[in-house]
Amino acid sequence: MYQPDFPTVPFRLGLYPVVDSVAWIERLLEAGVRTIQLRIKDKRDEEVESDVIAAIALGRRYDARLFINDYWRLAIKHRAYGVHLGQEDLETTDLKAIQAAGLRLGVSTHDDMEIDIALAAKPSYIALGHVFPTQTKQMPSAPQGLAQLASHIERLADYPTVAIGGISLERAPAVLATGVGSVAVVSAITQAADWREATAQLLAIAGVGDE
């Protein structure tokens, strides 16, 4: 049963781009995206604070669900919609502080054991990956594939879920057919020949999410 310790999110978050700049946040919100994540890696808080502030302001302007990856202190300070954490971040993050601030929490998982760990934290949603081979980041685990993804979805039942990893425009319908609530994409948009067209097509497939 879906009873998170954090504020709830819709079962369907819709198309969920993960991008590394405020410029991409603005472009995609203007294009109609309503769930998005700012993921800037390996910088100090003070180096990214201005970007976090700008991204959160854009999220508010477009009434969007904007998640900040990793920089949870800044997300709390500037009142983001939510925070997304990797497994390695769970042990070093003050989850109670995120909870007390009223922010949503998403957690990455790669196998059943990590799903168990995520469920223990009772987050707002659980991300499942990587589904297909991906060039976006180095992954220590093997791709799960659609059958394993479907198995995870069946196990998680009514828990909001996000599939991530190597999801292209062509693969998105099959991913959604597993019952997953939403699809996260990176290069399918940022490396597309025409990002506007790619975004429009992905929105037509995955939607903007439930209210």
UniProtKB/Swiss-Prot annotation:
It catalyses: 2-[(2R,5Z)-2-carboxy-4-methylthiazol-5(2H)-ylidene]ethyl phosphate + 4-amino-2-methyl-5-(diphosphooxymethyl)pyrimidine + 2 H(+) = thiamine phosphate + CO2 + diphosphate; 2-(2-carboxy-4-methylthiazol-5-yl)ethyl phosphate + 4-amino-2-methyl-5-(diphosphooxymethyl)pyrimidine + 2 H(+) = thiamine phosphate + CO2 + diphosphate; 4-methyl-5-(2-phosphooxyethyl)-thiazole + 4-amino-2-methyl-5-(diphosphooxymethyl)pyrimidine + H(+) = thiamine phosphate + diphosphate. Its EC number is 2.5.1.3. Mg(2+) binds at residues 70, 89. 2-[(2R,5Z)-2-carboxy-4-methylthiazol-5(2H)-ylidene]ethyl phosphate binds at residues 134-136, 166, 186-187. 4-amino-2-methyl-5-(diphosphooxymethyl)pyrimidine binds at residues 37-41, 69, 108, 137. The keyword Metal-binding applies. The keyword Transcription does not apply. GO terms for molecular function: magnesium ion binding; thiamine-phosphate diphosphorylase activity. Pathway: Cofactor biosynthesis; thiamine diphosphate biosynthesis; thiamine phosphate from 4-amino-2-methyl-5-diphosphomethylpyrimidine and 4-methyl-5-(2-phosphoethyl)-thiazole: step 1/1. GO terms for cellular component: cytoplasm. This is Thiamine-phosphate synthase. It comes from Salmonella agona (strain SL483). The gene is thiE.
